[in-house]
Design a protein with these regions (language model features):
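Charge-rich, low-complexity N-terminal segments
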Residues: 1-48, 54-117
């Protein structure tokens, strides 16, 4: 859960934007597919951040992308530190976000229910 308060929300949003730019523009790992950073949850002390990522593709492709992101965590954190100028850069933990898949599944169910007589 993101830290309540304006500073926590702003920092989480900045981390989300910067990590998304780093992933899309600088990471060259072939395991990482089309990944979208969907959100960031910060701990209360700003020392830990869960970065939620949605990846297109099969479950195997998603897992490989997650492995690629995890292996690039040190680089992403270093780049984040140089961009944000924080006293202490949060430890990053990448997590697959299945919300988009769940939304698609629910929309399919609702369409089917709507089309039933």
């Amino acid at each position: 859960m993101t830290v309540p308060g304006h500073r926590g929300e702003r920092l989480a949003d900045r981390i989300r934007v910067e990590v998304a730019e780093i992933i899309s523009g600088e990471l060259k790992d072939p395991r990482i597919g089309f990944a979208t950073v969907t959100g960031v949850d910060l701990s209360a002390d700003f020392h830990h951040a869960h970065v939620f990522v949605s990846v297109l593709g099969s479950a195997d492709a998603q897992q490989k992308s997650l492995e690629g992101l995890i292996s690039a965590t040190g680089y992403v954190r270093h780049e984040l530190g140089s961009r944000l100028r924080l006293r202490r850069v949060p430890e990053l933990a990448f997590v697959l976000d299945h919300a988009a898949e769940e939304n698609e599944r629910l929309e399919t169910i609702l369409r089917e229910l709507k089309n039933e007589p």
